[in-house]
Amino acid sequence: MSVTLDLSRMAPSMSKEGGDAPKALINLSGLTRAQLLVALTESGVAEHGKAKMRATQIFRWMHHRGVTDFALMTDVAKETRARLAERFTVSRPEVVERQVSKDGTRKWLIRMAPGIEVETVYIPSVGRAGALCVSSQVGCTLNCSFCHTGTQALVRNLTAAEIVAQVQIAKDDLAEWPSDKEDRLLSNIVFMGMGEPLYNLGHVADAIEIISDNEGIGISRRRITVSTSGVVPQLEALGDKTQAMLAISLHATNDALRDVLVPLNKKYPLEDLMAGVRAYPGLSNARRVTFEYVMLKGVNDSPDEARALVKLIKGIPAKINLIPFNPWPGTDYVCSDWAAIEAFGAILNKAGYSSPIRTPRGRDILAACGQLKSESEKVRASAMRKLSMAAMAGVLDDDDEAAA
């Protein structure tokens, strides 16, 4: 299989007054091994006949050992390291803020570029294992009414390097370099952070290939789950390109209600969504789809809704995650009573569907499901307020001088 790589597309120009715009350094962390081989060959960095070996060496340094400086790649020739540093980078984005919940959940606010921030969350489990919830976009276009992220307008897609960087930063903080395959703290990846992954499938697929590569981080694709609100035309491509586990952000059993909770449903209604799920590549009892269902008091939590859910997903190898609603500033929704959640789950269990109730984690640091929202908007709003105040101050100064 041949791989082509448009290096100019991956490194957008940066403006420079009075001359040609210099090219930004390409972050090699966002290249699959095949893409890395092409980059080294096309740039002329790798010695003749050694490009494949160099690609594997550099990949292992980035993703097995977690280095952020070419100078530390001691089994790469010194001259080659110098040429790499002239053209590429393996640096991390800036961690603006790190928070740790009383339950051990960790949240990082990561600045990918000026004004471009995302949140990433590590959720520890009962044992050593834990899941990392990564973002695929800055903001979101879907406007799900119960989701805090949906109140932030989409800024842009994240690149594969920016998605992978979230995993690298978590491993930095958890002190999990080198990437041992056993007894690891970070054992699962879930694309359930900010954004709709299927609206950024190319970069998401590359990131999954990098994260799952056994020469590096080596997290099995069966431990990587991609959650979508239901971009039906991309479901088959997701399965074919990534072999990742599928999760559907469902939350309603009829189109009228789902149109309100998940407006994307107006474009891809439940009948189309269920057909797409049934056709998902690799779906089986061993590779079940997960339906996510947020429990909203008086909205979607009745016994009748539970029975309708059983009917809706009949014949699909599935489990249902019942998610107690996590409040956020400004929402009108309220979490279902615990008794109502348990009664809902009992109906699903009786029908043969596993329906665990997700334990709320990280609520005290707004790191729980549906609570993520970057500080980008706040930063931009603050900057605008400062500019306005400065402008007003300038007007007042002018007025004072005129009066004098």
From Swiss-Prot:
It comes from the Bacteria. It is found in: Cytoplasm. Disulfide bonds join C133-C369. Binds 1 [4Fe-4S] cluster. The cluster is coordinated with 3 cysteines and an exchangeable S-adenosyl-L-methionine. SUPFAM superfamilies: Radical SAM enzymes. One of its GO terms (biological process) is tRNA methylation. Its main location: cytoplasm. S-adenosyl-L-methionine binds at G195, E196, S227, S249, L250, H251, N326. InterPro entries: Aldolase_TIM (IPR013785), Methyltransferase_A (IPR040072), RlmN_N (IPR048641), RNA_MTrfase_RlmN (IPR027492), rRNA_lsu_MTrfase_RlmN/Cfr (IPR004383), rSAM (IPR007197). Specifically methylates position 2 of adenine 2503 in 23S rRNA and position 2 of adenine 37 in tRNAs. m2A2503 modification seems to play a crucial role in the proofreading step occurring at the peptidyl transferase center and thus would serve to optimize ribosomal fidelity. It comes from Caulobacter sp. (strain K31). Its EC number is 2.1.1.192. This is Dual-specificity RNA methyltransferase RlmN. GO terms for molecular function: 4 iron, 4 sulfur cluster binding; metal ion binding; rRNA (adenine(2503)-C2-)-methyltransferase activity; rRNA binding; tRNA (adenine(37)-C2)-methyltransferase activity; tRNA binding. It catalyses: adenosine(2503) in 23S rRNA + 2 reduced [2Fe-2S]-[ferredoxin] + 2 S-adenosyl-L-methionine = 2-methyladenosine(2503) in 23S rRNA + 5'-deoxyadenosine + L-methionine + 2 oxidized [2Fe-2S]-[ferredoxin] + S-adenosyl-L-homocysteine; adenosine(37) in tRNA + 2 reduced [2Fe-2S]-[ferredoxin] + 2 S-adenosyl-L-methionine = 2-methyladenosine(37) in tRNA + 5'-deoxyadenosine + L-methionine + 2 oxidized [2Fe-2S]-[ferredoxin] + S-adenosyl-L-homocysteine. Reaction proceeds by a ping-pong mechanism involving intermediate methylation of a conserved cysteine residue. Keywords: 4Fe-4S, Cytoplasm, Disulfide bond, Iron, Iron-sulfur, Metal-binding, Methyltransferase, rRNA processing, S-adenosyl-L-methionine, Transferase, tRNA processing. One of its GO terms (cellular component) is cytoplasm. Belongs to the radical SAM superfamily. RlmN family.
